[in-house]
Regions:
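Conserved, mostly hydrophobic/aromatic
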Residues: 5, 33, 74, 94, ...
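Flexible glycine/acidic-rich beta-alpha junction loops that bind and position SAM and/or redox cofactors
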Residues: 12-16, 35-46, 77-84, 100-125, ...
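Short, electropositive alpha-helical surface patch
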Residues: 15-29, 82-99, 124-129, 158
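Proteins enriched for Cys/Gly/acidic motifs involved in redox and nucleic-acid/cofactor modification
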Residues: 31, 53-64, 88-96, 105-113, ...
Length: 209
């Protein structure tokens, strides 16, 4: 009943794709666009062919084309040569973005890659500290994104029930919980009422079965 797109590059974001997401309710209003780093210097070191300004314009375009869209991303922390100032620049940039979810990874050496051979590897304790700081920001950004939808009624596809609480996903990939009687695998109109765990708690308004 739901189709979710995987990780995409900017060149894949065509007007036709936006129209498809808007017009076909099977498609989730969710896009995963990997940023990788929020510092232009680190992006250049990673040999990425974009900078933060270009990425910000891309996000602005996506949000204007698909209202309510959720944009998730990947962030790599501790890339060789990353300074504290560059890491802080990354935090500052991410803080300005409206990400629904951030997957934060520490840089891991891959044998045979130029980065693995560099002598300016970030020490593991420093890398670990930066991961924790970026994850804390990620949690804050997720909560900030969820707050935008409290009070709205959205379609939720419920999936699993545990101890009387059923959870599922909106079409823009927000985890929703309810203690109402619902059937797994069915879509319901749910009023989103308050932050709860990693998502929002709500109550069923209409069943779309």
């Amino acid at each position: 009943k739901r189709l979710r797109l995987g990780s995409l590059e900017s060149i894949e974001l065509s007007p036709d794709l936006f129209e498809l997401i808007r017009s076909d309710e099977r498609f989730c209003a969710h896009l995963h666009l990997p940023l990788q780093a929020g510092s232009d210097a680190v992006l250049k070191d990673m040999n990425r062919h974009y900078d933060t300004a270009e990425f910000a314009r891309l996000i602005e375009r996506v949000e204007s084309e698909v209202p309510g869209v959720a944009v998730s991303t990947d962030i790599i922390v501790g890339f060789p040569g990353e300074t504290e100032d560059e890491f802080q620049s990354g935090l500052d940039f991410v803080a300005k973005m409206n990400f629904s979810r951030m997957h934060v990874f520490p840089y891991s050496r891959r044998s045979g890659t130029p980065a693995a051979e560099r002598q300016d590897q970030v020490p593991e304790p420093v890398k670990k500290d930066r991961v924790h700081r970026m994850q804390a920001l990620a949690a804050y950004k997720a909560e900030e994104f969820h707050r935008q939808f409290i009070g709205q009624t959205m379609r939720v596809l419920f999936e699993t029930t545990t101890d009387g609480i059923t959870d599922g996903l909106t079409d823009n990939y927000i985890r929703v919980y309810t203690d109402d009687s619902v059937e797994d695998g069915e879509i319901y109109e749910v009023r989103l009422e308050q932050l709860y765990q990693d998502g929002i708690f709500g109550h069923v308004v209409v069943s779309n079965k």
